Structures are given as structure tokens and as C-alpha cells.
């Protein structure tokens, strides 16, 4: 539906999810339809300089650019991808369906949302389809 509005946190999360799904699946480029200075009436997800979608691109940049990609695992319920940036390990994980349980690797004790809000974790974490970054 081209007249559906996809904005804010939903747009941010969809961009992060699409980007990490693409990396996981070996898709080296993901193109967005249009980037405009102001919202365009026919598109559902707007890429403008201050949109939620662009905030998603900034999160992907912070989490992945400059990292060494160490591959992904998919247990059928959760996909997790290991990265290392400047010697610091991280894992990005998300549920393949509505929810899934994931235990972060040893040493990764914080879970960071796509809003870059981090909380301490230990043991299994319930994930949704929105990627979460686990860091030391």
C-alpha cells in the first residue's frame, strides 16, 4: 500500500533489519528508492535527512562500518551475526519469526536497541524481529 505511513522507530527498525538481513544473506547492496529533502506523498517509508529511516542507516553505520564480519548462524528461531571492531567483539541478533530466545556469547553483557539504548543482560534474552546488538 503506497499510502501507508512508515516513520519514526518503525522505519528505523525496518532499515536496520533489512540491512542486517541483507548482510546475513550475502546481498552486498540494498538500494532505497528515493531520498528527498521533504516527505514525498506516494512513498510509505521516507528517507529524508531527519527521518526514522535515516536514523536506521546511522545505526547500521555505527554497528557495522569498520567492523570485521565474522559470519552468521541461524538456529531456525534466531539469526546472530558476529562482528569485531577495533578488537572489541559484538553480536547482532534477531528473531526469525515474531520472537525467539537467544543467549549472548560469553563476555557480551549489554543489549543495545536500535535506539542505541543499552541495558545489562545475563542469560537468555527474548528477541523480536528487530536486531539487537550485544556488546561487552
Give the location of each predicted region.
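Aromatic- and carboxylate-lined catalytic core of secreted/periplasmic carbohydrate-active enzymes
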Residues: 13-100, 128-133
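Beta-strand-rich binding/interaction modules
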Residues: 90, 98-120
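Proteins with a high burden of low-complexity, intrinsically disordered sequence enriched in S/T/G/P/A and R
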Residues: 1, 37, 95-97, 112-115
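C-terminal beta-strand-rich structural cap/linker in extracellular carbohydrate-active enzymes
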Residues: 119-136
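Generic structural motif
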Residues: 69, 78-82, 107-113, 121-123
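The substrate-binding groove and active-site-proximal loops of carbohydrate-active enzymes
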Residues: 1-9
Amino acid at each position: 500500500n503506497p499510502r501507508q505511513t512508515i516513520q519514526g522507530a518503525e522505519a528505523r527498525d525496518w532499515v536496520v533489519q533489512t540491512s542486517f538481513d541483507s548482510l546475513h544473506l550475502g546481498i552486498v547492496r540494498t538500494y532505497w528508492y528515493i531520498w528527498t529533502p521533504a516527505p514525498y506523498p506516494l512513498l510509505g517509508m521516507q528517507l529524508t535527512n531527519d527521518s526514522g529511516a535515516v536514523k536506521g542507516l546511522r545505526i547500521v553505520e555505527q554497528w557495522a562500518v569498520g567492523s570485521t564480519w565474522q559470519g552468521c548462524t541461524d538456529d531456525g528461531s534466531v539469526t546472530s551475526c558476529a562482528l569485531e571492531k577495533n578488537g572489541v567483539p559484538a553480536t547482532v541478533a534477531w528473531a526469525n519469526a515474531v520472537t525467539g530466545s537467544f543467549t549472548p556469547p560469553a563476555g557480551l553483557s549489554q543489549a543495545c536497541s536500535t535506539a542505541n539504548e543499552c541495558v545489562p543482560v545475563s542469560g537468555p534474552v527474548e528477541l523480536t524481529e528487530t536486531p539487537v546488538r550485544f556488546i561487552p
